[in-house]
Amino acid sequence: HNYNARLCAERSVRMPFLDSQTGVAQSNCYIWMEKRHRGQASAPGQLYTYPSRRWRKKRRAHPPEDPRLSFPSLKPDPEQMLKKEGLIPPDGSSLEALLRSDPIEKRIIPDPRDDDSLTEFPTLSRSARKRILEPDDFLDDLDDEDYEEDTPKRRKGKSKGKGIGGARKKLDAAALDDRDKPYACDICGKRYKNRPGLSYHYAHSHLVDEEGAGAEDKEDSQPPTPIMHRSEEQKSKKGPDGLALPNNYCDFCLGDSNTNKKSNQPEELVSCSDCGRSGHPSCLQFTPVMMAAVKTYRWQCIECKCCNICGTSENDDQLLFCDDCDRGYHMYCLSPPVAEPPEGSWSCHLCLDLLKDKASIYQKQS
């Protein structure tokens, strides 16, 4: 109780601060009243009434704008031209005065005025700063965005700060998009969250004319856009058939096609068509039927696996894998849909039509 009382008392008297417990920026909410603030009850069931404080936004004391930051008029007058000469640095003003044969008085008069304007600026800013820090003002209720938006406009007087902020926001949004969707199509630049989505896009959009596009990209010595430059780097990792170049080693035993380090026997590698990772069928625990089936389609590893019907890898916890061909299917994409994964082995409709009674689902049940 004492700790909470001290914490609440500290929050009531301190300036806005970042609470380390909740991570919230605490501000003075003016809910703490004293006995002298009590008034008579105005409605049945009330004991006291307290005066309400109407919220008002702080009227900022803007320092006088430096005339050097003001926009020039469209039709310059002779008097304004003389004023501008006083605002130019000393070397430039004296040089122009000599060239125009102006008297020395015109060069001397603007100097103290500039000095006064420069000396008045910090004094006014100090007084404005004192007024900002007064406890009676309601600056606590102002958002930080008010300061961030108004301060650059008052200081520079140009729209340059706004443009920079907008460009920075666009860059941040682009960086977030790149981070959320790291896999980009090397032909059209479309981005995906995972590699299976990108491979599905390749298979249905660019697989037919990928060879011709690859030949045209090789002729260009200097690609016009960074996307095309990135596409050439990615195309170098793909074969002429659009498949990823396979690794020459097994991801599980680190052996190659000549030696399986688990069995010390030569064994052919099976490679993923999307990422190029390879593995021995025995390391992948493939059956002989599955070893023959994976050679007939674009096989995908477990990390790149997507549904053979909808082509996406979303809801991978709903994917069923065929025990005969290792294809993946969403349980809700099947016809009819399946609510729970079946017990034992399961065969897809393609393997049931091809293998008939030799499918794994019948072998396990018999």
Curated annotation (Swiss-Prot):
Compositionally biased region (Acidic residues): 140-149
Any Pfam family: DPF1-3_N
Gene3D superfamilies: Zinc/RING finger domain, C3HC4 (zinc finger) (3.30.40.10)
Keyword vocabulary terms for this entry: Apoptosis, Cytoplasm, Metal-binding, Nucleus, Repeat, Transcription, Transcription regulation, Zinc, Zinc-finger
Zinc finger (C2H2-type): 183-206
Recorded GO MF terms: zinc ion binding
CDD domains assigned: PHD1_DPF2_like (cd15691), PHD2_d4 (cd15530)
Compartments, as annotated in UniProt: Cytoplasm; Nucleus
GO cellular component terms, A-Z: cytoplasm; nBAF complex
Region named Disordered: 41-94, 140-167, 211-243
Basic and acidic residues biased stretches: 76-86, 229-240
Superkingdom of origin: Eukaryota
InterPro entries documented for this protein: DPF1-3_N, Znf_C2H2_sf, Znf_C2H2_type, Znf_FYVE_PHD, Znf_PHD, Znf_PHD-finger, Znf_RING/FYVE/PHD
Any Gene Ontology biological process: nervous system development
ZnF PHD-type span: 247-307, 304-354
Protein function: May be a transcription factor required for the apoptosis response following survival factor withdrawal from myeloid cells. Might also have a role in the development and maturation of lymphoid cells.
PANTHER family recorded: HL01030P-RELATED, ZINC FINGER PROTEIN UBI-D4
Similarity-based family: Belongs to the requiem/DPF family.
Protein name according to UniProt: Zinc finger protein ubi-d4 B
Originating organism: Xenopus laevis (African clawed frog)
